[in-house]
């Protein structure tokens, strides 16, 4: 109970309060009630306050109003102040400069005025009018302090007595705070009571409510709005639940009223304000009841309100800062600790019974029993009894703390340590309602965070003395996803505030299905730290150049382990899609790009240079040592788990809203059918300087990926999973309309990567090395665009023999894989690929600039078989392809056997001559014993009279009025599923001699060694024969050099030099032998959709499965065999060109005759332009040997072998003009009956023939197709086109041509005379034709005779030791990779020591790669022909001079050798060698001069002949350079 207050002091206190009523302006006496006596009382009604005398720091009081105010003296000696309806309208006053201690000075001044007023003498008569009249003057005098300090103790005692007996109670308090933008916050307090009990000040507040509203200007007083009447223009929807207050008449001026906070009671007790010297507040105790915070309404407040509040708080904190005094020094603190002296605390206790935070209408957070106990010597603690989150009546949060507080904060002042601990495991069940409530809060807070600048927070300094640590127990989060639950378990978290570091051992993410829990992801050793100073980390950009990441937030993770299946991924996507739909509406608003500082380039000084690196600012950098992912396919269990590993990864969240991720090493593997397969792996494992994987996501959603130094694998066996998935495919369900997502673009770049493709059954591998590739993907719809620059193709025959690790340094991928065992087979130019998806159709366009292939016989077979086996084989048993058992048809099921039998008639006896029918059937079945292949010509085959007398028209069914199944349009087909367009501008295929594979070379060497051993072991000399790879035939005799024969056979050499090395030349030849060139090749593949019905529901229709159309504009085969002087093996016949757009057109269709049977058939149609062939026998033998090579390792054996059945084959008539040069005759084959060897006896020049149009039906396989065509075309040529062939035989060609000229001399005049009856003109025309034909042929005959004479002379000279034909090629060097060279050196022939001449060797064998000397090439005498007679004479003069120079040089060398000779025999030998050259060389020059002159004359007469000669004969290099000039 408070002490008694003397009456004089009581009156003085009342006088002071009345003096302070001076803030009332123009008080109306009608509203003033005064009661004097033993209990003096003053009552005021509806008084407007004069706000000019109110001074509150950083606050401007706009208006004030109080409805009722009573001041009275209590009989017990106290003073009561009672008020009702107190309203204030205030506005925050923000200024850059404010007083530092305004609040403290105002409080001290008020205490001093109160004390002085009570110490002054009272007037004798206390009348109300006098008090009011003198209030102002007395108040001014009271402000002067007493001059003497002797009364300080009395003054303090009087003040204490006065305050202890002062009671203030005000109800219905309303404070309205105005903000810019017509925003306001209103604070309502039901009652406020101030009292003192036992020297303890008590403040009780009841029914507190804080709300926000928007103000609407009054139409009557728009200019005076927000003035003194603004306090009555507030409408509060929450006041209906409050027991006080009435609504204002102008409540309609407020709109969008939201309650922000409600509190039922607030009880405050404190010590202090007892004297002038003691105005501090000590031992402050706060006790709150139930507090409701409406967070959803708070974040909906306009951002301008938050900006003002933040700045106001910042300035208020600056004003209340007190400079350090002695009691804050460390020495003073240590003294108080040693003396056990307790320091006065401002807040000693804080209690909240229940704190309820409303996130939405259904989700509420409840915090119960919050207590603060603050002691100086002992540890200060803050405890939280219980925390719950409720979704309606469902508890989402549970902390297993038992009876203990779930949350505790301990402050140890001695150790300067703060510990925040959670005393139980946290279980959080996240519901969809909770997520839908939390998402708008998060995005709104992010928006507020971006909009607020937090003015003044930079000046707030956090104490660094205390070490704050946060410790939690296990945190378990559960999120319902579909029918199951996604659970996250976070191990105890440790947070160091001083170090700004958060650490936890690991986080596990699991899938809870019924009672089963399975881990999906585990993250280990997570550490996240914030640094006050920026740190830098090395990173990379899109060009894989080094950059620097600058950030303050850094995290590290030891490992990330992912374990999931395809069903888990689908479950996550389907289950999380509702949550994504919740986030999507908030993602439409484009966030503001934060650019606190622009990216800069940083110069890094080194010892000898300056390195410029780009500097990128990041919000957070996360370093991950190791990422492992194990992905399994539940629907395809046989594929196994796909394990992926990424090492040394970095994840950066940049300030420009982009994301960067890169990893230095990427590996992937799987176990398929108990065999481990590699998916992708790094190529270079040592000295890796750039990341293997780089991913960057930009703000607009575009994703860019860079892959480097990685080999990607493809195994054909993986496609078996498609068959497995077909069996498990569920029935398609009708899907509801789904909104089309935004288009996503992904750009992938590959640098120094490789694609390794492995076939299904073979051990070979096809490798594509890519230096640079750009892949652009956009979805949806799925569109792909790929550009590859200069890919290189490599091939390996057996991957088990590859070198797995190469320690040597390598310059490029090609060199690396070459060392590993791969062979380079070709390269390509620019390759572009486009894939578009439209509806159910996929369109693939491939454009290739150039393809160059260089391949040998063994690698060619390996390549073809690998391409065939690059997909799983498809084969079916005969039961699925054909109807092996005829189905029984009950023909007589509904036939009445007695229908034609008369009633009463007995059954006739069975006839005994029914064998007549059997004889008829037996005699007639021979007519159908065999089905023959039908052949047709353009005019139709002549009708043939068969033995039975019937006349058959074989072309009846191929007439124009009957549709023929020549294209896919004849058959019904379904919609197109896939379309492939391939366009190759130029393709070159170079066929090399020799062998690429070590296995092939070792096999040949082993067989040769075995042959030599077998020959030496024979008792009687004999011949041993064997064959290899179906193309190499070997035999050995005791006197033969088997290795020399093998090299001759493999390298296409007829004669081997005597000094030939004993080592066989089995490696690929340095220069190609055959060059196949194709230009403007177009390929179109169309795959159609088809059904696979059963026999019961089948309609027995024919299905078109796919079709292929190939067009080639030009197709040429260039002859580069060393022993051949011809240039083009095959080219287009130019004089017969009919204007066809393509030289070759091929159409292939794959059909299924019966829809429910799996048997397929081919329909082939070919169109070929007229051909010009220059066939050299050596070249032909090389092509045959090349194409017949067969290695058993590459045989493809199907489970159910099948032969390609050709339903229909059609080829047009082909005009062929053939030149053939035989080299040798196989007499053994001729004796065996091979009549084709007779062609090797004749040389053909311009033999004309026509391969007539053929249509074949029912051909079993390509081999049978070749036999059928041969059996049709060969008899036709020998029967009806023998004259055209004989005209091309060289000895007969001139005679036939001259004979045709003589014939024209007679037939032409007769024909012309019959037409115009003019004898003279007819004779002139006949003579002109005769001269043109005979003169041209005589000139060509002269050329052949001169060239033949020159060849004889050159051979004779070479026989006597001269250069022979090599003299013409002395200056002709082979360009790189063009024509095969011949050596320039020859063996020396000793005229006196040997009488046996060496074998004629005009063409010296081609060396392999081991040879260092570049040989010369063989040039025909008909090559390098002059264009006209003038150039012919000029070249004749040059040829004659060159040969005379050679003869003169031989004589000069003989004279020099004779002078330096020791004996006469040596001198004679020198002259003997030079004599044949000296005599023969001038004759060779003369014959060559005649030949060149006649060639010039002939070419001038026939210009087209020169073009034909250039196509036929190889040109020398100097002649080609001359033409270019």
UniProtKB/Swiss-Prot annotation:
Key word Endoplasmic reticulum present: yes
Q: Which branch of life, at top level?
A: Eukaryota
Catalytic activity as recorded in UniProt: a 1,2-diacyl-sn-glycero-3-phosphocholine(in) = a 1,2-diacyl-sn-glycero-3-phosphocholine(out); a 1,2-diacyl-sn-glycero-3-phospho-L-serine(in) = a 1,2-diacyl-sn-glycero-3-phospho-L-serine(out); a 1,2-diacyl-sn-glycero-3-phosphoethanolamine(in) = a 1,2-diacyl-sn-glycero-3-phosphoethanolamine(out)
- One Pfam annotation reads ATG2_CAD
Q: Subcellular location, in the record's words?
A: Preautophagosomal structure membrane; Endoplasmic reticulum membrane
Any one cellular-component term (Gene Ontology): phagophore assembly site
GO terms classed as biological process: autophagosome assembly; autophagy of mitochondrion; glycophagy; lipid transport; pexophagy; piecemeal microautophagy of the nucleus; protein transport; reticulophagy
One function term, GO molecular function aspect: phosphatidylinositol-3-phosphate binding
Parts forming coiled coils: none
Print the keywords alphabetically. Answer: Autophagy, Endoplasmic reticulum, Lipid transport, Membrane, Protein transport, Transport
Q: How does it sit in the membrane?
A: Peripheral membrane protein
Role noted for this protein? Lipid transfer protein required for autophagosome completion and peroxisome degradation. Tethers the edge of the isolation membrane (IM) to the endoplasmic reticulum (ER) and mediates direct lipid transfer from ER to IM for IM expansion. ATG2 binds to the ER exit site (ERES), which is the membrane source for autophagosome formation, using basic residues in its N-terminal region (NR) and to the expanding edge of the IM through its C-terminal region. The latter binding is assisted by an ATG18-PtdIns3P interaction.
> What family is it from?
Belongs to the ATG2 family.
Name the chain's protein: Autophagy-related protein 2
Record the organism. Answer: Eremothecium gossypii (strain ATCC 10895 / CBS 109.51 / FGSC 9923 / NRRL Y-1056)
Organism lineage reads as: Eukaryota, Fungi, Dikarya, Ascomycota, Saccharomycotina
